[in-house]
């Protein structure tokens, strides 16, 4: 935190201050196709080098670490990080697969489809997404979810901050499933956060579905 205190704030992902970015005159801008608006990216591309990431799988996330490391002249550090992450990927516990739903929002209830990074993480840790046939972040109902009878329902800490009280709310309708609060960072943050996230997932997965 101390290292980034002096880094200027240039707005939000949907509301960047383009003039402030121009004043900083960055060597490289890293954008995300889902988080940033197309018109902002195109405007910045007129004056700066912009890497536009679109990450839907663990493999794509590792590739972007490689690419950004190369662009920033820190390939050795990037490759070391990739190696360490791959070590964790190779340490998935030998546990039985479970069917699972991962909820990200309430009112309306929303889950994740097969073309998301979250889905990729779930699959790697043997949590078979019951919304595998859906795209992106589908709106669902708890009544329909209960008919799918997932072994496990995961309530993420973000973007909706699910709490203990929501377990009771979901269990009233999905009484046949185990319901668990999870740290959203484990499933949805990529880049350098993958390493601590995957360590936690390996530890937690050993305790689920025993």
Name each model feature, range by range.
Residues 1-210:
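N-terminal ligand-binding lobe of clamshell/alpha-beta domains
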């Amino acid at each position: 935190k101390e290292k980034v205190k002096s880094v200027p704030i240039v707005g939000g992902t949907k509301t960047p201050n383009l003039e402030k970015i121009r004043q900083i005159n960055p060597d490289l801008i890293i954008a995300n196709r889902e988080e940033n608006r197309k018109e902002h990216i195109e405007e910045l591309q007129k004056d700066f080098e912009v890497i536009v990431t679109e990450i839907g799988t663990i493999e794509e996330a590792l590739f972007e670490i490689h690419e950004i490391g190369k662009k920033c002249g820190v390939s050795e550090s990037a490759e070391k990080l990739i190696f360490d992450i791959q070590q964790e990927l190779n340490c998935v516990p030998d546990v039985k697969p479970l069917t699972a739903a991962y909820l990200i929002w309430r009112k309306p209830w929303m889950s994740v489809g097969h073309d998301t990074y979250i889905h990729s993480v779930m699959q790697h840790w043997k949590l078979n997404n019951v919304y595998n046939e859906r795209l992106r972040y589908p709106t669902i109902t708890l009544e329909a979810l209960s008919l799918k009878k997932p072994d496990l329902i995961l309530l993420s800490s973000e973007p909706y901050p699910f709490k203990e009280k929501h377990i009771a709310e979901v269990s009233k309708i999905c009484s046949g499933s185990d319901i668990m609060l999870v740290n959203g960072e484990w499933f949805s943050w990529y880049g350098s956060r993958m390493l601590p996230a995957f360590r936690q997932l390996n530890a937690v997965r050993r305790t689920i579905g025993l």
